[in-house]
Amino acid sequence: MRGALYIGMLSALFHLIFFSGQLQAQELRANVEINAQAATNVDPQVFQELQQAIASFLNERKWSSDNFEDFEKIECSFFINILEAKSNDQYNASLTVIANRPIYNTSYTSTLINRFDKDLTFTYKQFDPLDFNENQFINNLTHTLAFYAYFILGMDYDSYAQNGGEVYFQKAQELVNNVPSTSGFSGWRSFDNNNQNRYWLVNNVLNSRYTSFREGNYTYHRLGLDRLVDSKDTAMLSLLSGMSSFSEVGLDAPNLPIMQLLSDTKKLEWLNLFSEEKSDIKSAALKSLTTIDPNNIEEYRSRFK
């Protein structure tokens, strides 16, 4: 049970264990928005209905075997930007996925995922159901949404227990493997978008060579952020330990999709978190950031003076 991962947290932050006869609540509280300004030749009602259908797909489907109360749901957002509407009800779009986790004993949250996916092509006719089959690729839109639902769960569970999200990353990888190489949909193949794709994203996470990434996720969030209020000095050491784990991956294999995801997700948090700390803390964080996020290292140096 995911509830076991929250031992010692406030009741508003840990997962209760239900009796089998009780109602099973879903895991996600997903906000869905569609920007269709570019689709001037399509009735806006089509996108309003699609937006509602996607929200229902994400929020009403059971993605795990664990039981969640309403206040335990993972807060996340799916932003779809329609780039082109074709005459055959086909759309080219981009997708931004953001997911947050609460920080124990505070009113703050930490962003776990901030992912921009440029490869979303799908077909949708008004009133069409959003079909989905975990074992078969039948709809690129729902397949992509499901991939990110499982990836969110994997990152969330990993942040509470070492490798706690394994089963969800495995499910995300199975979705990748179910897409035929001849599908014609970009984002699933190893060579799509200069390797910044779904294939490599989940492959990186599950690769034993990069276990330090997942170790860092747990140490940084559960042993670091969650303990800042109760034991700041110890928590800060754990935060730096988590950063060091991330740095090991960046040093071993620069430009990995998971490292790009990490930098995109955590940059603002790191700037705010470490900029007011003691010089030794800032120096240690900066050392790790040199390999975690080299493209923004000058900004970190400027803020950590």
Q: Where do the PLM segments sit?
A:
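Positively charged n-region of N-terminal signal peptides that target proteins for export
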Residues: 1-5
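Start-of-domain marker
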Residues: 26-92, 103-105
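A cross-kingdom marker for long, charged
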Residues: 33, 215-305
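Second-shell loop/turn segments in exported
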Residues: 37-44, 131-139, 251-252
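Sec-exported extracytoplasmic/periplasmic mature domains
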Residues: 55-63, 154-158, 271, 275
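Acidic/His-rich structured neighborhood in mature extracellular/periplasmic domains
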Residues: 89-203
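Flexible, glycine-rich surface segments
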Residues: 161-256
